[in-house]
């Protein structure tokens, strides 16, 4: 046995021993000890496979370094190089982002399987014999689903049909799954245009290891599998080709030359795409390879080509990267991702930037170039996995500290992170000082890290909290003179208007001592109804109604039908285009979803006499940091706070019992859910409609019980007339949701519900008739590219518009034509503020870790009458036992009081 083989097998023995000790709850493979063993294992294998000397010494450090450079140039060993790169990074860096641990474990398992297969087939060397004990999550339903898909991938069905589709696609996610220790992939993708909706996704399956960095073209065929009594159509990828959009290469070239000159119909482009496809090498790796390898690849690609402009640009870029000049981190990320909409946001179209190597890059990119792990590009927040793949982490440790604190604040609503929670970092004071010194001078006040007592925080977040609270306190110093008597007269004149004593008392006291009112209440307690009463009370005054989402705004518009009212989303109000800011009263609904930054901007921009803030701290929170609504009542007088308790949404006492127990995390949550029949096994009844007003809610888009598959199941059972548009199928009577494409905005807004009522095809277009969940008149539709053709039986408007069959993904102005998505099922987040007679919620073990208390409570309270929660008994126990309320409000409020003398 050679020395290198012995080294490999010795490392293998240690790894197998560790694998045998792991279980599902122990992510022990992420420990530094195991990472060190894995690194040695991979490096020994690289030395064996890349050396021409069979007696290579495994302990020769210089030879190891040399051979690892060779590894980077070996297309057949790309997986080994990527695994080594992954192991070079600290696992703690990867786990800074949500669900990163699970993704990391899947990556390890995938790479280890590839190593075992490769060494067995190529070297007749048997390693990792107990790989089946590796701790990845498994589920019987998912196993059956994956086995059926794998069978279709491995055995081409005679009934399958190839899809004639040649458009470019963006890969959103590739998730491996494993059947009989063979690797397959679930690939989620969208059309490659600049405005494609992130919700308009398609899933396909393959055994091919596809590079996910760039736009691609797929050869796809359809097949069918059976899940229970249901047939499901699946897409299978037979082959793939990298196909970077020419506009992306043009815009990348513009960064260096200030002009665009790349075409997709030239030899260099074709050869480069073939090289990327065959070797799965991304452009960043190519441009950072050793000189001899780069030059040899370049020579092959540009051979016989008349136009070599692309490689002239690459040569300039390569020099910047090799010398780590200003702008190199921006270029690294752009080379790694090549996404047109991201790239365009970074370009300075009217000149160059001296501070960024005189490239055509905006000065606003500079913070990212200097601190890529703690700041964002213009209009884009990179994922931690992508950053770690393309930018070295050396000399960036202070950024990971800042990222940890920011993530803890935004994800967990912890404004002040305890120093004891930062044990993974050493020399914290030095890191804080280093981070603050690196900040751009205009960002020092807002983004700097501060210490107070035993906590560390980001200055801007604490300052925003303080300013919001101070404004609220100012509004509580005095009330409206004569207010209570004014309300009493109105109540006397409208004796049957209010049938809830709590609302009546709230109305009588609301502005007697304050100019701001906080209205808290669980789902269905009539918060919107109270808004209506207050609005009618002040019918003569000018009023502004704000909410974060279009459905919430439209709900207010339907609820409040009096004069002197404006309705808009928070984003629209804060837009520079909006100049109307003065109102007598401002109402903000679903306040818990509003981040502190936006709340502060509203208070700065809006001029008002009375402010009414309405919401529920137990429902879905702000995507960005937003704790103002939960901590405000700890600072303001009780006379400004009103809690609604009586539930009116449902008359079902059992349902209200479950809502209450979940809201308050009481004992007996599970018993009530099971006893009242709300808990269901994952079975075919998911797809059987029980009520005309019914919705299926999912947390994720992918997987067996994700939105995409549920939509596919239910659409398959729709016998309506159909049309195929690229990779999508649309049928008459499909429910739809309009997306954020802005094609018909603002009149047809994001999340507006609709139903396809007719479809017609011409040679060049598809014409859709859509019934929309609102009523328009002809004046509303002027200047829009759709036609108002009538009304449905229930009065809703029906509109008609066409889409071009031909999709162009080459150009900068390529836009997705279809402005809606199929919506038999929707995400729980999209359902906030909506209610249905019947609600089905699907929770598989794939998503159980992402089910928070707020998300679960929001989901179950969408139901008026019937509720069905589909999950396995094991998942039910784990979800309910892991529900926690975020309890940082009192601690954060206490520190704020001391820090700002509030």
What is the predicted role of each segment?
Residues 2-218:
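Extended low-complexity, intrinsically disordered and solenoidal helical-scaffold regions
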Residues 482-495:
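Conserved adenine-nucleotide phosphate-binding loops and their immediately adjacent elements
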Residues 495-513:
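Pre-Walker A adenine-sensing motif
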Residues 509-512, 516-674:
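ASCE P-loop NTPase helicase motor core
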Residues 525, 564-568, 650-653, 688-902:
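Core RecA-like ATPase module of SF1/SF2 helicases and allied nucleic-acid translocases
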Residues 662-706:
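Helicase P-loop NTPase motor core
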């Amino acid at each position: 046995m050679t020395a290198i083989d012995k080294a490999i097998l010795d490392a293998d023995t240690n790894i197998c021993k560790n694998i045998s000790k792991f279980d599902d709850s122990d992510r022990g493979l992420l420990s530094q000890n195991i990472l060190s063993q894995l690194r040695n294992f991979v490096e020994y294998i690289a030395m064996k496979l890349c050396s021409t000397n069979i007696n290579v010494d495994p302990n020769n450090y210089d030879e190891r370094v040399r051979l690892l450079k060779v590894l980077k140039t070996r297309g057949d060993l790309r997986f080994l190089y990527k695994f080594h790169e992954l192991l070079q990074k600290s696992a703690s860096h990867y786990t800074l982002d949500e669900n990163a641990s699970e993704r990391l474990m899947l990556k390890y398992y995938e790479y280890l399987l590839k190593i075992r297969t490769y060494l067995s087939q190529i070297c007749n060397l048997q390693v990792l014999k107990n790989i089946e004990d590796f701790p990845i999550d498994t589920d019987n339903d998912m196993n059956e689903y994956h086995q059926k898909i794998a069978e279709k991938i491995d055995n081409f069905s005679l009934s399958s049909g190839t899809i004639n589709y040649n458009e470019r696609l963006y890969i959103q996610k590739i998730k491996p799954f494993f059947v009989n220790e063979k690797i397959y992939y679930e690939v989620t993708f969208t059309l490659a245009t600049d405005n494609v909706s992130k919700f308009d996704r398609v899933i396909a399956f393959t055994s091919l290891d596809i590079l996910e960095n760039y736009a691609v073209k797929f050869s796809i065929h359809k097949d069918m599998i059976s899940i229970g009594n249901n047939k499901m159509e699946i897409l299978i990828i037979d082959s793939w080709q990298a196909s970077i959009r020419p506009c992306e290469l043009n815009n990348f070239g513009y960064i260096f030359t200030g002009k665009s000159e790349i075409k997709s119909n030239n030899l260099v482009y074709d050869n480069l795409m073939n090289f990327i496809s065959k070797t799965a090498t991304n452009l960043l790796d190519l441009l950072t390879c050793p000189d001899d390898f780069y030059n040899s690849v370049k020579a092959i690609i540009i051979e016989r080509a008349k136009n070599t402009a692309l490689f002239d640009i690459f040569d300039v870029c390569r020099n910047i990267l090799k010398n780590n000049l200003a702008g190199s981190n921006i270029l690294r990320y752009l080379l790694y991702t090549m996404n047109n909409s991201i790239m365009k946001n970074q370009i300075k179209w009217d000149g160059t930037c001296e501070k960024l190597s005189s490239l055509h890059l905006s000065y606003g990119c500079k913070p990212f170039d200097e601190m890529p792990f703690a700041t964002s590009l213009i209009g884009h927040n990179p994922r931690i996995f992508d950053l770690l793949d393309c930018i070295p982490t050396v000399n960036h440790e202070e950024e990971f500290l800042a990222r940890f604190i920011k993530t803890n604040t935004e994800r967990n609503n912890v404004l002040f992170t305890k120093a004891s929670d930062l044990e993974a970092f050493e020399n914290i004071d030095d890191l804080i000082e280093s981070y603050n010194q690196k900040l751009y001078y205009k960002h020092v006040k807002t983004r700097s890290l501060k210490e107070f007592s035993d906590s560390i925080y980001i200055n801007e977040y604490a300052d925003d909290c303080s300013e919001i609270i101070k404004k609220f306190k100012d509004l509580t110093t005095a009330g409206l003179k004569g207010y209570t008597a004014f309300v009493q007269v109105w109540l006397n004149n409208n004796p049957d208007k209010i049938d809830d004593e709590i609302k009546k008392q709230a109305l009588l006291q609301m502005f007697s001592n304050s100019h701001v009112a906080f209205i808290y209440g669980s789902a269905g307690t009539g918060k919107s109804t109270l808004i209506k009463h207050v609005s009618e009370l002040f019918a003569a005054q000018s009023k502004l109604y704000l909410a974060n989402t279009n459905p919430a705004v439209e709900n207010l518009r339907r609820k409040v039908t009096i004069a002197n009212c404006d309705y808009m989303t928070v984003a629209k109000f804060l837009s520079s285009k909006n100049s109307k800011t003065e109102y007598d009263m401002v109402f903000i609904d679903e306040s818990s979803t509003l981040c502190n930054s936006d709340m502060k901007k509203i208070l700065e921009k809006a001029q008002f006499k009375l402010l009414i803030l309405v919401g529920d701290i137990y429902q879905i929170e702000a995507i960005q940091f937003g704790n103002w609504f939960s901590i405000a009542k700890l600072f303001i007088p009780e006379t400004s706070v009103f809690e609604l308790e009586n539930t009116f949404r449902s008359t079902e006492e059992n349902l209200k019992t479950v809502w209450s127990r979940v809201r308050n995390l009481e004992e007996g949550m599970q018993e009530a859910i099971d006893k009242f029949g709300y808990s269901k096994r994952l079975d075919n009844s998911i797809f059987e409609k029980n009520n005309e007003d019914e919705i299926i809610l999912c947390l994720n888009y992918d997987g067996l019980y994700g939105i995409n598959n549920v939509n596919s199941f239910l659409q398959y059972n729709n016998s309506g007339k159909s049309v195929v548009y690229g990779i999508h199928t649309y049928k008459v009577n499909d429910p739809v949701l309009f997306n954020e494409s802005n094609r018909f905005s603002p009149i047809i807004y994001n999340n507006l519900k609709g139903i396809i009522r007719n479809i017609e095809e011409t040679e060049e277009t598809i014409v859709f008739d859509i019934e929309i969940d609102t009523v328009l008149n002809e004046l509303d539709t002027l200047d829009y590219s759709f036609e108002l053709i009538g009304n449905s039986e229930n009065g809703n408007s029906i509109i008609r518009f066409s889409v071009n069959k031909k999709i162009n993904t080459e150009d900068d102005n390529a836009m997705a034509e279809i402005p809606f998505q199929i919506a038999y099922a929707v995400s729980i987040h999209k359902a906030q503020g909506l209610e249905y007679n019947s609600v089905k919620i699907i929770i598989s073990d794939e998503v159980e870790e992402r089910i928070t208390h707020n998300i679960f409570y929001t989901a179950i309270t969408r139901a008026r009458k019937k509720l069905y929660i589909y999950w396995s008994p094991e998942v039910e126990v784990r979800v309910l036992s892991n529900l926690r309320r975020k309890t940082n409000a009192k601690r954060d409020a206490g520190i704020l009081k001391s820090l700002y003398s509030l």
